[in-house]
UniProtKB/Swiss-Prot annotation:
It comes from the Eukaryota. It catalyses: a ubiquinone + NADH + 5 H(+)(in) = a ubiquinol + NAD(+) + 4 H(+)(out). Pfam families: NADHdh (PF00146). One of its GO terms (cellular component) is mitochondrial inner membrane. It is a multi-pass membrane protein. The keyword Transmembrane applies. The lineage of its organism: Eukaryota, Metazoa, Echinodermata, Eleutherozoa, Echinozoa. Keywords: Electron transport, Membrane, Mitochondrion, Mitochondrion inner membrane, NAD, Respiratory chain, Translocase, Transmembrane, Transmembrane helix, Transport, Ubiquinone. This is NADH-ubiquinone oxidoreductase chain 1. Its main location: mitochondrion. It is found in: Mitochondrion inner membrane.
């Protein structure tokens, strides 16, 4: 029982820095592009634009209100979540000092999981 709890916390401690790094790199990209275009950039929400990144991420998930008429609504709205799940699942197989999952055929599993993103694209219409 404790092994599962430990594995879950190890997984969380690996994925949270990945998500924060993506948010920080998005912040840096927006700031650099803002300075290149001689504008200040979006710095009006929260603590030095960090809250704006999470607001933008949330907006990307709930922004699309127009759905194709022939699309299944459950599959159409579950496709972004499937994309995010697959992307975060692939980070578990990165070669680090103590990987969350250490499998013999992890490269083959990474290739198989990365090919599943096609189904998320098909589900989104």
């Amino acid at each position: 029982m404790y092994a599962y709890i430990f594995a879950f916390f190890e997984l969380i401690t690996f994925l949270v820095p990945v998500l924060l790094a993506v948010a920080f790199l998005t912040l840096v990209e927006r700031k650099v592009l803002g300075y290149m275009q001689f504008r200040k950039g979006p710095n009006v929400v929260g603590l030095t634009d960090f809250c704006n990144l999470f607001a933008d991420g949330l907006k990307l998930f709930i922004k699309e209100t127009v759905k194709p008429s022939s699309a299944s609504p459950y599959l159409f709205f579950a496709s972004p979540v499937l994309f995010l799940t697959l992307a975060l699942l692939l980070w578990n197989f990165m070669p680090v000092t103590s990987p969350a999952l250490d499998l013999q055929l992890s490269l083959l599993l990474v290739l198989g999981l990365s090919s599943l993103s096609v189904y998320a694209i098909l589900g989104s219409g």
